[in-house]
């Protein structure tokens, strides 16, 4: 956790996006100003908005609209793609089935992961093997989400190039053994109005306080519903106020280890206190599934010369988290 920030910084990354594959990227003053802002945001807040990202606003809105359409379907229709351990933890989960720190979260969701072939990572990924369960209704749901996935994956690569430069690493530091074959997670989430949940099952938390597991998260949230909160160093909760046309970005656990603590992920939660149903689509850009993440030399040199964290195999970290995130006995 960085500072006692009261607002979350907004970064126009258009210079970085425009020159992302230019061999002279790091020689551009405009690009290096974006890099400076990314560095400051990662240190001070662990969260930032990006604009000038190149993803069409029409696509961002359409993804939210189709998400809302799916969650408005009857429960029996949504349960056609019900998540279980047998589905590789992919599919639909009802309100209260996701658990954060032992407490049920007041949201429903479709969880998707990069498809994993049987035996692709040996026993490491056995729990998550399989393909995603896409709903048949709306009929264009799968096609739209796969187009969206392609765009946000590419955007994440661009932002991570900027973060690599901010840490004093080569621009492609996250494109080799660390994240050259990135794993990804997509959570398509709906937060009901609290009074629509039976009182006996209701809590006040849409998603409990947590940090994310991987390198970078991109959140596509409703334009007008204020619910995502980020905790500053003093323990105050600061709203990530919706800003149309932007993504809310935050860094995760793997980047903390890789940077040897130069960047630390920030606790965040969701509390939907409004009288409106809220949707959010979170894309998690992760390392290679079988990558062993460890502090890198350039970051250790800036932090005393000693590794502060043990090595972590990303896939082990993810599977352990996934298997503790759902209510036992409901499957």
Please describe what each predicted stretch is:
Residues 1-331:
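Peripheral, non-catalytic segments flanking oxidoreductase cores
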């Amino acid at each position: 956790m960085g500072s006692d920030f009261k607002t979350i910084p907004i970064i126009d990354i258009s210079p970085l996006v425009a020159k992302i594959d230019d061999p002279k990227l790091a020689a551009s003053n405009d690009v290096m100003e974006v890099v400076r802002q990314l560095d400051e945001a990662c240190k001070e807040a662990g969260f930032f908005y990006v604009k000038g990202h190149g993803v069409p606003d029409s696509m961002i809105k359409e993804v939210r609209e189709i998400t809302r359409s799916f969650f408005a379907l009857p429960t029996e229709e949504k349960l056609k793609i019900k998540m279980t351990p047998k589905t590789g933890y992919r599919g639909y989960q009802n309100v209260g089935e996701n658990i954060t720190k032992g407490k049920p979260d007041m949201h429903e969701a479709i969880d998707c992961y990069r498809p994993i072939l049987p035996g692709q990572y040996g026993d490491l990924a056995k729990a998550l093997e399989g393909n995603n369960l896409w709903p048949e209704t709306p009929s264009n749901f799968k096609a739209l989400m796969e187009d969206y996935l392609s765009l946000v994956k590419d955007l994440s690569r661009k932002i991570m190039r900027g973060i690599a430069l901010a840490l004093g690493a080569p621009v492609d530091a996250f494109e080799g053994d660390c994240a050259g074959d990135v794993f990804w997670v997509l959570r398509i989430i709906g937060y009901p109005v609290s009074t629509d949940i039976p009182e006996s099952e209701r809590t006040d938390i849409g998603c409990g306080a947590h940090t994310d597991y991987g390198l970078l998260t991109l959140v596509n949230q409703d334009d007008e519903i204020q619910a995502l909160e980020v905790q500053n160093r003093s323990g105050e909760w600061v709203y990530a106020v919706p800003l149309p046309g932007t993504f809310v970005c935050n860094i995760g656990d793997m980047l903390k280890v890789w940077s040897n603590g130069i960047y630390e992920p920030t606790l965040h939660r969701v509390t939907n206190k409004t009288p409106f149903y809220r949707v959010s689509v979170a894309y998690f850009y992760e390392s290679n599934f079988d990558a062993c993440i460890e502090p890198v030399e350039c970051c250790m040199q800036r932090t005393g010369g000693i590794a502060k964290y043990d090595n972590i195999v990303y896939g082990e970290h993810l599977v352990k988290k996934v298997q503790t995130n759902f209510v036992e006995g409901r499957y």
